A protein has these predicted regions:
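Aromatic- and acidic-residue-enriched carbohydrate-binding clefts of CAZyme catalytic domains
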Residues: 115
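N-terminal small/glycine-rich loop or linker at the start of catalytic domains
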Residues: 1-12, 45-66, 100, 104-108, ...
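Hydrophobic faces of well-ordered beta-strands that scaffold small-molecule active sites
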Residues: 12-15, 37-39, 67-71, 94, ...
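Alpha/beta enzyme core
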Residues: 80-110, 118-195, 215
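Active-site beta-loop-alpha junctions enriched in small/polar residues
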Residues: 17-19, 42-44, 72-74, 99-101, ...
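Glycine-rich, positively charged N-terminal anion/phosphate-binding segment
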Residues: 2, 17-92
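Alpha/beta catalytic cores of nucleotide-metabolism and tRNA/nucleoside-modifying enzymes
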Residues: 4, 8, 12, 18, ...
Length: 322
């Protein structure tokens, strides 16, 4: 598939996970096979008001490319202004968030709340498309709730407004992340539009990725929560789609080696103080499912320095060897 002039293989992309898909996560994901990444959602109002925190979310390193920055908001002019400001960071595309279900975003008219106002969503897409000379992509859900499944109508409006590609999460806003993803709604969107469609939701294994490809006809799949502490999933999906081979899960040693590198990148980009505190959640994700993981989870929450991480890694590996 192509987003603008960018050709992407039929493998998997990293979703714009808030609080997770930062520079370190995007770089690690690219190293392990993600063909495309989308950064954390960034407030259009925050950018327009000069928020340093919002601007920091847009920073991109060469090792992460190709990548898109993601913006959210409910005002066409503000979204267009934010998109123009994002051009400074030279992303390959601008992604618009019409899918975030969390109350602090949707409750303020952003994210998935726009699914209740397709006409306004279309005006936002049109404004952003006119503001930048980059492909503009859109991420949205099946609908607001089970009584209002409007993804097909919504997709057509976004396409008519100039969107270059669409990402569909096969759940409604009210469903959040709980029930199994609805592959049928992704298939219906794919059949309704002529631009590329990316399927999202429950892609947690190579087999799940292939099933989404096969049952929806989507052009690409996007991995979200399943990539946390598990960047190997991208490589495993890539190999499975290309050859049918199911690569083994990483060894404990491989997991800990990549955890250490991930934390080093966090410290490089955010400084040691912030990086080591963010290492807490990443450590708990990397050790998930390993021998003694429940016992070590408390230690993950106490990490404040590199030596704390080293001790944790040593203890985890010792536990796995027993």
């Amino acid at each position: 598939m192509k987003i603008g002039n960018i050709e992407l293989p039929k493998t998997a992309a990293l979703a714009p996970l808030a609080g997770v898909a930062d520079r370190a996560m995007r770089e690690i994901s690219r190293e392990y096979g993600a063909c495309w990444t989308v950064g954390e959602m960034t407030s259009s109002k925050g950018l327009s008001f000069g928020s340093k925190k919002s601007a920091e979310l847009l920073q991109i390193g060469e090792a992460e490319r190709p990548t898109a920055v993601q913006l959210f908001g409910s005002e066409p002019e503000t979204m267009a202004q934010a998109a123009e400001m994002a051009m400074e960071y030279a992303p390959e595309a601008i992604d618009i968030n019409f899918g975030c279900p969390v109350p602090k975003v949707a409750g303020n008219g952003g994210g998935s709340a726009l699914m209740k106002d397709p006409e306004l969503a279309g005006r936002i897409v049109e404004a952003v498309v006119k503001a930048v000379k980059l492909p503009v992509t859109v991420k949205f859900r099946a609908g607001w709730d089970s009584e209002h499944i409007n993804a097909v109508e919504f997709a057509k409006i976004c396409e008519d407004a100039g969107a270059a590609a669409l990402t569909v999460h096969g759940r409604t806003r009210m469903q959040m992340f709980a029930p199994p993803v609805d592959l049928e709604i992704i298939r219906l969107v794919k059949e309704a539009v002529s631009i590329p469609v990316i399927g999202n939701g429950d892609v947690d294994s190579p087999e799940a990725a292939k099933r989404m490809y096969d049952e929806t006809g989507c052009d690409l799949v996007m991995v979200g929560r399943a990539a946390m502490g598990n960047p190997w999933l991208f490589r495993r999906i890539e190999r499975y789609m290309q050859t049918g081979e199911l690569l083994p899960e990483p060894t404990p040693e491989e997991r800990m080696t990549v955890l250490k590198r991930h934390v080093e990148l966090l410290c490089k980009y955010k400084g040691e103080y912030v990086g080591m505190r963010e290492a807490r959640k990443h450590s708990s994700w990397y050790i998930k499912g390993m021998h003694g993981a429940a016992e070590f989870r408390r230690e993950c929450g106490e990490i404040t320095a590199p030596e704390d991480l080293e001790r944790l890694i040593d203890r985890v590996l010792l536990s796995c060897s027993e």
